[in-house]
Amino acid sequence: GIGGKPVQTAFVDNDGIYD
């Protein structure tokens, strides 16, 4: 979730949602 965008990927980034 770069910039907080909830993009569904195989990983969870620092946003705590998706990459």
From Swiss-Prot:
Record bears the keyword Lipid biosynthesis: no
PTM info: Glycosylated.
Keywords: Antibiotic, Antimicrobial, Cytolysis, Glycoprotein
Covalent S-S links between cysteines: none
Gene Ontology BP annotations: defense response to Gram-negative bacterium; killing of cells of another organism; neuronal ion channel clustering
Coiled coil: none
Organism superkingdom: Eukaryota
Keyword Membrane: no
Role noted for this protein: Has antibacterial activity. It inhibits fish bacterial pathogens, A.hydrophila and M.luteus, and also E.coli, P.fluorescens and S.aureus. Forms large ion channels responsible for disrupting the cellular envelope of bacteria leading to cell lysis.
Protein's name according to its UniProt entry: 27 kDa antibacterial protein
Source species: Cyprinus carpio (Common carp)
